[in-house]
Amino acid sequence: MAAEEMQWPVPMKAIGAQNLLTMPGGVAKAGYLHKKGGTQLQLLKWPLRFVIIHKRCIYYFKSSTSASPQGAFSLSGYNRVMRAAEETTSNNVFPFKIIHISKKHRTWFFSASSEDERKSWMAFVRREIGHFHEKKELPLDTSDSSSDTDSFYGAVERPIDISLSSYPMDNEDYEHEDEDDSYLEPDSPGPMKLEDALTYPPAYPPPPVPVPRKPAFSDLPRAHSFTSKSPSPLLPPPPPKRGLPDTGSAPEDAKDALGLRRVEPGLRVPATPRRMSDPPMSNVPTVPNLRKHPCFRDSVNPGLEPWTPGHGTSSVSSSTTMAVATSRNCDKLKSFHLSSRGPPTSEPPPVPANKPKFLKIAEEPSPREAAKFAPVPPVAPRPPVQKMPMPEATVRPAVLPRPENTPLPHLQRSPPDGQSFRGFSFEKARQPSQADTGEEDSDEDYEKVPLPNSVFVNTTESCEVERLFKATDPRGEPQDGLYCIRNSSTKSGKVLVVWDESSNKVRNYRIFEKDSKFYLEGEVLFASVGSMVEHYHTHVLPSHQSLLLRHPYGYAGPR
């Protein structure tokens, strides 16, 4: 028996599939089978492999043109081949296993595409493991594969009687456990690309994005550095970013556009009375300019009333009463502002005395000034100014937004109709400003917005991602450029998966990291995955002529 054992061949480690097939003699059977993964992380994976039975050894390759085997093992010591009913699933309907006489040796699992294929493979394996036991075991005719199923499997699955002691524990079997480390960058030969774009099932424990689990893996610095940046702004930024463009950007444009219009009435109407009543012109004009502005705008409201109906007497009487009320408010406000600022103390008495004159002056030329001041109420930024002091307090201190905060409540309480009218008209003025500023600020805001959580898919399998993509469309036709980011099946990095409508399949791009920079190809480096994704929204992906990132998976809002 020992002499027989010496004749068991040892699998060759560096031989291509085609070389093995063309070797004279020895090849019993060759074809594609699904092989179960060998490590704990690959137990649920059944990648398709090109399997060759050659001289009592089994080799499996990634494809029929691979230059070297993915793994190989000798059938020495294996004494039984059986159906693997426990491994039967909807994807693996015809599995079988090759069992060693020693429980310390690995049991190999394969899955055929049909019942006849399984019978054929099991018959050939049975014949190979019984090669040196033909005198004890009847040779099995492969033609039995078409015979009765029970009788066939009964003969094939019967164990071969061999001695355990004659099979040493050390052998020359080997297997590359990085068998699923193949991420094809499609249609382009390159150093990073392996021979096939097979997809692999899900069984990678850590989820893709959540922060709590990532720190547990100390050996994943780049994944941690990537995810630690994105979750922190995920919750806070969306509310401010939705609020800021409405409150911040629109008032800035409104103020830029309205600043000139506000200066014009301030110069035309109140400028001459200031010179008469306020001799010092050093820093006083800026203060009364803002003080008189609210009062003057209130006088514009009565000015609008006589202009629209065209009645002079009633409008003058109502406007005078409004002028008295507003002048009192202005007196209080001016005394408050003067007391807070402190430089001029002699101004409060003359200013209220002149205030009714300003109002009358504004009322007398109402027919002529109506054309000038008619656009002022709709353009006056009453609603936004309430929100502006927060950003504008530091940006434009010279405009003195603080005095405007205090008169606003009084002015809004006294003429509710006028304020509501300005509110409606200002909504019309705010919409174009939002559209204009949205284009300018969108790039800056987008750089700060992290990728949505839905982009990160908790799977290591491309076919699972393809299933998710097809589920987004009732007809099973995903949008071109639909993309997500999944985990790598064996590495600690990420994989960008993109739906290519032209070829009707997903494309896988490994996301590499070097010196805290991310890239798909070495020529273009990015500081973060988000900036890389943004880049490929406008630039064609590597190894493709027209594929762009267009639609993040699971994100319904605008980009």
Curated annotation (Swiss-Prot):
Query: What residue spans carry the Pro residues bias annotation?
Result: 202-213, 233-242, 375-386
What domain of life is recorded for the organism? Eukaryota
Classification via InterPro entries: PH-like_dom_sf (IPR011993), PH_domain (IPR001849), SH2 (IPR000980), SH2_dom_sf (IPR036860), SH3BP2 (IPR035848), SH3BP2_SH2 (IPR035847)
> Where are residues bearing Phosphoserine located in the sequence?
S277, S414, S425
Which keywords does the record carry? Answer: Phosphoprotein, SH2 domain, SH3-binding
Q: Where is this motif: SH3-binding?
A: 201-210
- Extract the GO molecular function terms from the UniProt entry: SH3 domain binding
Q: Which residues carry this modification: Phosphotyrosine?
A: Y174, Y183, Y446
Q: Does the keyword Phosphoprotein apply?
A: yes
Which parts of the sequence are annotated with region: Disordered? Answer: 164-449
Domain PH residue range list: 26-130
By its UniProt entry, which CDD domains does this protein fall under?
PH_3BP2 (cd13308), SH2_SH3BP2 (cd10359)
Record keyword Transferase present:
no
What residues does the SH2 domain cover? 455-553
Query: What SMART domains would the database entry show?
Result: PH (SM00233), SH2 (SM00252)
Q: What does this protein do?
A: Binds differentially to the SH3 domains of certain proteins of signal transduction pathways. Binds to phosphatidylinositols; linking the hemopoietic tyrosine kinase fes to the cytoplasmic membrane in a phosphorylation dependent mechanism.
Please report the name of this protein according to its UniProt entry: SH3 domain-binding protein 2
Species per Swiss-Prot/TrEMBL record: Mus musculus
Biological classification of the source: Eukaryota, Metazoa, Chordata, Craniata, Vertebrata
Gene name per UniProt: Sh3bp2
